From Swiss-Prot:
It comes from Homo sapiens. Keywords: Keratin, Repeat. The keyword Repeat applies. Residues 5-112 are annotated as: 11 X 5 AA repeats of C-C-[CDPQRWG]-[APRS]-[CIPSTVD]. Interacts with hair keratins. Belongs to the KRTAP type 2 family. GO terms for cellular component: cytosol; keratin filament. Disulfide bonds: none annotated. This is Keratin-associated protein 2-2. In the hair cortex, hair keratin intermediate filaments are embedded in an interfilamentous matrix, consisting of hair keratin-associated proteins (KRTAP), which are essential for the formation of a rigid and resistant hair shaft through their extensive disulfide bond cross-linking with abundant cysteine residues of hair keratins. The matrix proteins include the high-sulfur and high-glycine-tyrosine keratins. Transmembrane segments: none annotated.
Amino acid sequence: MTGSCCGSTFSSLSYGGGCCQPCCCRDPCCCRPVTCQTTVCRPVTCVPRCTRPICEPCRRPVCCDPCSLQEGCCRPITCCPSSCTAVVCRPCCWATTCCQPVSVQSPCGQPTPCSTTCRTSSC
């Protein structure tokens, strides 16, 4: 397909009439259609030519992301209510280890510090 594409790394790639570009700053291999505006990027393996979407839309624009989409065993974040007062519990993820789950207290701003006791098994 021909047409203007966004981004320098994937400027020559297009799929489904849309452009492909990195969806996460921390994971340049992760591509998504540029039309995805409010999305949650999953930590996935590199997909050649962005042949399939690897993001999911948020139901609300305000989302809580305690792990900041760090690489590792992070699960896709869930969208909080617009007030962001719901308590979200999910693993605090790092590169190679999984810490004990931490609670994100209202107003879903920052997670409590990650537990020093980490497990080596997958989350």
